[in-house]
From Swiss-Prot:
Pfam families: Ribosomal_L10. GO terms for cellular component: large ribosomal subunit. HAMAP family: Ribosomal_uL10. One of its GO terms (molecular function) is structural constituent of ribosome. SUPFAM superfamilies: Ribosomal protein L10-like. NCBIfam families: PRK00099.1-1. Transmembrane segments: none annotated. This is Large ribosomal subunit protein uL10.
């Protein structure tokens, strides 16, 4: 990589750090190419990205971003996972790390908040924004459904009473 390519890469990575909702940093020593491709495809399917970057370039790219506090995590063979949704990158990275012990979560950032490995794992256990929206819609719809059942119940009960009374009169 010559200087121009490095500048372009740092500018691109800086933009990715600024736009992302969360960033996860992990060691990937010992992962095979197939495992790394699997991680990338899972992250891409979830709406995130995985990037292997030189530590020095990643530290430069972090300057001027909210995630600047994670610069100390860039030692050794590191991989960066990031996504616009704050839950996506931690969730996919932690799930992948459970299946592949060679991916070791070092920490990350969510906005200006720096997270250690346990913080990333806690963040991964939270529901995503789409899941929360679905739960909220379900909670909003439930009272309306109950109200519809309650308002229709008295009318149907009255109809049953009248029908039973009519059958009783016919039998007599």
């Amino acid at each position: 990589m010559d200087r121009a390519e490095k500048r372009e890469f740092v500018a691109w990575l800086n933009g990715a750090f600024k736009e992302s909702g969360s960033v996860v940093v992990a060691h990937y020593t010992g992962l095979t190419v197939a495992q790394m491709s699997d991680l990338r495809s899972k992250m891409r399917d979830a709406g995130g990205s995985v990037k292997v970057a030189k530590n020095r370039l990643a530290k430069i790219a972090l300057q001027g971003t909210e995630s600047e506090g994670i610069a100390d995590l860039f030692t050794g063979q590191t991989v960066v996972a990031y996504a616009n949704d704050p839950i996506t990158a931690p969730k996919v990275a932690v799930e992948f790390a459970k299946a592949n012990d060679k991916l070791v979560i070092l920490g990350g950032a969510m906005g200006a908040t720096t997270l250690n490995a346990d913080g990333v794992k806690s963040l991964a256990s939270l529901p995503s924004l789409d899941e929360l929206r679905a739960k909220l819609v379900g909670m909003i719809q439930t009272p309306a459904q109950r109200l519809a059942v309650l308002t229709s119940a008295p009318a149907s009960q009255i109809a049953r009473v009248i029908g039973a009374h009519a059958r009783k009169n016919e039998a007599a």
